[in-house]
Amino acid sequence: KSGLHQNAVYALLKEAPSPKEIASMHMTHLANLLKVNSHGHFTKEQAKELRVLAQKSVGANDSAISIQITQTIQQIELLDSQLKKIEAEMTDIMKFNDSVIMTIPGIGYINDGMILGEIGDIHRFSNPNKLLAFAGLVPSVYQSGNFQAKTTKMSKRGSRVLRYALVNATWNVVRNNATFKAYYDAKRAEGRSHYKALGHCAGKLVRVIWKMLTDEVEFNLE
């Protein structure tokens, strides 16, 4: 979690959901609350700065908004808890399933489950391009004069869940496999953005996954 989604922020807003309540908190209590719930990331100086900002806040003290903030945080925490349970169940299922794509460095059980769940029977796809199209990772060719370039672009078509899982998995694979890292770096060196370079790598990963699932072979780029 990062930004607004931090345990320290939730803990503070549940106890003091308005600037007035934060401003009136005892400094020691405020500093300790933030420190404990951020595992030491919030310092006493930051707590002081926060209380000063709260004291300077001119916003209306609306109790209805305070109640809404508290209830929203409780809903987020409930969803977080449910998500963790689902992810734990997915991990157990994927460990039992022992799919060949788990041999891909960095792919992870959750991405594995999302990818396999969306693909279903790999034999529905007679070639990797059909799987690419299903994922919304469409191979395209741009031509201008004597220049021809092939790219993999993101599309709003296809399975959004599969596309999300593939792109997320691809970034993990890039950071854990030298061949994919070199391919990513080469695309970046060509002047492509991080997202476009990742799209190329995702296209490569789809072809690898298609081959692995079709032939029931483990990850091997040699």
List where the protein language model places each region.
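A detector of single, family-specific signature residues
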Residues: 1-222
